[in-house]
Amino acid sequence: MEKAYRIKKNTDFQTIYKRGKSVANRQFVVYTYNSNKDHFRLGISVSKKLGNAVTRNRIKRAIRENFKIHKEDIIARDIIVIARQPAKDMTTLEIQGSLEHVLKIAKVFNKKIK
């Protein structure tokens, strides 16, 4: 994912946490905040409580891949995805399905996704 699509600064994360709206399921919490950009920006948070670096990076890769697949279908917003404990035991396809579910609830897609 290109640099323009990333949220890295702590101040950006804090703004989205405070002013954004949150939606959750068992595996993920998603914060969304309307931005003035012409595309979405993504921040990913995976706690050390979820496992070692290999496990955390696998979860982050699966989340990033899901956003790459739906890049054209996502509304221009700042989005933060926080992984919860059950996500560590899921396969990439299960992560994709669960993430799509919570993103539909958050109304981040600009059209219907199967």
From Swiss-Prot:
Keywords: Endonuclease, Hydrolase, Nuclease, RNA-binding, tRNA processing. InterPro entries: Ribosomal_Su5_D2-typ_SF (IPR020568), Ribsml_uS5_D2-typ_fold_subgr (IPR014721), RNase_P (IPR000100), RNase_P_CS (IPR020539). Transmembrane segments: none annotated. GO terms for molecular function: 3'-tRNA processing endoribonuclease activity; ribonuclease P activity; tRNA binding. GO terms for cellular component: ribonuclease P complex. It holds the Pfam family Ribonuclease_P. Consists of a catalytic RNA component (M1 or rnpB) and a protein subunit. Belongs to the RnpA family. HAMAP family: RNase_P. This is Ribonuclease P protein component. The gene is rnpA.
